[in-house]
Curated annotation (Swiss-Prot):
Lineage, highest ranks first: Bacteria, Pseudomonadati, Pseudomonadota, Gammaproteobacteria, Pasteurellales
Gene that specifies this protein: queC
Pfam family, one: QueC
Official protein name in the record: 7-cyano-7-deazaguanine synthase
Binding residues for ATP: 11-21
The record's free-text note on cofactor binding: Binds 1 zinc ion per subunit.
Length: 222
């Protein structure tokens, strides 16, 4: 196999995974980065469309993996037309086992391609109560995958301890601020450009406004 270090990014076409993609490209070079996108039965096709467009636009190979069988065994607001709300400690947008599945399938693919580094955009700081976005889960999954496949994976989570404001700052540092602002999709309701009301849109816009305010203030003080 090619000895050149390569990376694969778990990629949804959203703000976080696109930021990770730019990070991977900066570190490994665009020719050595691939993305894996999952069709898991999400309510809106726009997520898959955005992911495909960005991958093509940036010139990275995209592999689409169908894990929609999960719809037959779990229920949530990400895959069904229902009101988004908090249910106990976890919002009903949480998809049981999703990130575990994503990491498992990505690892299987990565090993076949001779890739050891996997990027995922999960974040514990603004994680909305999703247990599979925690650092302890990712580290546990990394160990499990290494043991399961007798292969040394390195799961990278560059956003793990960043707030959304800091994620926007990282995008700016990577030279991708405008690109991510214009081309990524985050809305739970599938609205192009965002609905401005769902938890995901609110978190994204709050972080954006905080970063722009801080950046403007910093420029004035120079």
């Amino acid at each position: 196999m090619n000895s050149t270090p390569k990376a694969v990014v778990i990629f949804s076409g959203g703000q976080d995974s696109t930021t990770c993609l730019f990070q991977a490209i900066q570190e490994f070079g665009v020719k050595n980065v691939e993305v894996v996108t999952f069709q898991y039965g999400q309510r809106h096709a726009i997520e898959l469309e955005k992911a495909a467009w960005i991958a093509k636009d940036l010139g990275v190979k995209q592999t689409l993996i169908d894990t929609s069988v999960i719809k037959a065994i779990t229920s949530n607001a990400m895959m069904e037309e229902r009101e988004i709300k908090q249910e106990g400690n976890t919002p009903n947008t949480f998809v049981d086992g999703r990130n575990a599945l994503f990491l498992l399938y990505t690892a299987i693919y990565a090993k076949g391609q001779g890739i050891r580094t996997i990027f995922t955009g999960v974040c514990e700081t603004d994680f909305s109560g999703y247990p599979d976005c925690r650092d302890v889960f990712v580290k546990s999954m990394n160990v499990t995958l290494n043991l399961a496949m007798d292969y040394n994976f390195n799961i990278r989570t560059p956003l793990m301890y960043l707030t959304k404001k800091q994620t926007w700052a990282l995008a700016d540092k990577l030279g991708a601020f405008d690109y991510i602002r214009q081309h990524t999709h985050t809305c739970y309701l599938g609205v192009e450009g965002g609905c401005h009301t769902c938890p995901s849109c609110v978190l994204r816009e709050k972080g954006l406004n905080e970063y722009l305010s801080e950046k403007t203030s910093g420029q004035k003080n120079v």
